[in-house]
């Protein structure tokens, strides 16, 4: 059965009854955001962007992950930007997924090192792809920041490759799109760029154990 966020609490098969261990479904971006909160004790409110093979996000409010009434808050990957755009895995066209997931870099995740070596060494084709990606990402961030005016954390597989020049370019693009004067103070690179999903998935169980000790 194909699972989408918001459907995980309405499964048609009894997963829990099939496993001898406690289990829960957590959206990967929510897990990553939990890890981010663990790494940043002073972080209170933020919008976490998981920039990986697929695009995902999590909304952090008062150090809690907000999933919404139906479980699909922050599933920004399926915001339709272009009805005639590329087909998304959800079956619709032109979703943010088709513009801001790492698949748009036209390389396998295993080849990200090579791709960014080309970008930083001024390879023309690689830079064209990267600039197009940053423009689309800036467009998405600007739209979301108008809705949730908080810190935006750039995480996922992309995070270790981001440099200050990339952040500066995002601010520049956002400034050209937003109707408001924006301070360059709301974009941050993830503090937990590696193993954040697995760590975040485990942390609630660790916390539960510590509370029982």
Residue ranges and their predicted role:
Residues 31-33, 56-57, 66, 159-162, ...:
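Short, active-site-adjacent cap segments at secondary-structure transitions
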């Amino acid at each position: 059965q194909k699972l989408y966020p918001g459907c995980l609490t309405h499964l048609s098969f009894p997963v829990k009854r099939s496993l001898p261990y406690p289990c829960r479904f957590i959206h990967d971006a929510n897990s990553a955001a939990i890890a981010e909160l663990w790494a940043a004790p002073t972080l209170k409110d933020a919008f976490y962007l998981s920039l990986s093979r697929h695009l995902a996000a999590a909304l952090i409010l008062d150090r809690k992950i907000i999933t919404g009434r139906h479980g699909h808050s922050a599933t920004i990957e399926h915001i339709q930007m272009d009805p005639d755009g590329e087909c998304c895995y959800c079956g619709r066209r032109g979703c943010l997924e088709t513009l801001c997931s790492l698949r748009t870099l036209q390389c396998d995740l295993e080849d990200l090192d090579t791709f960014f070596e080309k970008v930083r060494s001024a390879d023309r084709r690689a830079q064209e792809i990267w600039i197009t990606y940053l423009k689309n990402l800036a467009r998405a961030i600007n739209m979301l920041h108008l809705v949730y005016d908080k810190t935006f954390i750039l995480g996922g597989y992309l995070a270790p490759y981001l440099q200050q020049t990339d952040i500066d370019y995002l601010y520049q693009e956002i400034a050209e799109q937003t109707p408001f004067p924006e301070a360059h103070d709301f974009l941050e690179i993830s503090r937990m760029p590696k193993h954040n999903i697995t760590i975040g998935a485990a942390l609630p169980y660790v916390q539960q154990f510590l509370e029982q000790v």
